[in-house]
Amino acid sequence: LRDLDRQGFVGIRLNLVGKPNPTFDQNEWSDHLARIVDLNWQIEIQAESKRWPDLLPPLLAKGAKVVADHFGLPDKTSGVDDPGFRALLSTGKTGQVWVKLSGAYRNGPNGEQIVKAAYPLLREAFGTDHLVWGSDWPHTQFETVMTPSKARQALDSWVIDEKERQTILTDAPAHLFRFPV
């Protein structure tokens, strides 16, 4: 991992959709997590929002930086009222969690409505300095309906304020990904 760090790597990504929760506080995960925290890397997680109450506490207790992918994937039916999404919001003041604004289409037919309702809540909970945008390219399973330019245009519809967009597009990722400024 140290070799990867010297090459500019800044984190790992876990796609946990449809997979069991890792036991971050046990054995090899605990050791691996300690190394990731020591390197000041992030752990980007794609998981259904109902899982945040179980996933986040052990990671935050170890001092990990976490990026919740796709607005935290709020439940397609309950949207921003989803208890898992609310649990994600409750971690905003820790300073250890970022949320990636990406892939509204992954929240079903009402995805755009859900993320438009989610953005003000995320902004209030995390501040724009802990929100980053992602194109979600190559849009797996949605290649025929989504393009990088459509994904970028979607951000403009979610985040109306130009200064907030600037922070989300440049300042927050520069800090998270350790880009020189």
Residues of each region from the PLM?
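Catalytic cores of alpha/beta
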Residues: L1
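Glycine-rich phosphate-binding "P-loop"
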Residues: L4, G8-F24, Q141
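Short, active-site-adjacent cap segments at secondary-structure transitions
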Residues: R106, H139-Q141
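Mid-to-C-terminal alpha-helical segments outside catalytic/metal-binding sites
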Residues: L121, F126-V132, Q141-V181
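Active-site glycine-centered loops adjacent to acidic/histidine catalytic or metal-binding residues
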Residues: D136
